[in-house]
Structure formats: C-alpha cells, structure tokens
Amino acid sequence: YEDAYALQYCPR
C-alpha cells in the first residue's frame, strides 16, 4: 500500500 492511506487517515 502507499502512504495515501496513512495520509488520508491522519487524525491530525
């Protein structure tokens, strides 16, 4: 997976 997930799920 790409960072696109973590970036969109970033709560901050």
Swiss-Prot record:
Superkingdom of origin: Eukaryota
Designated name of the protein: Unknown protein 1
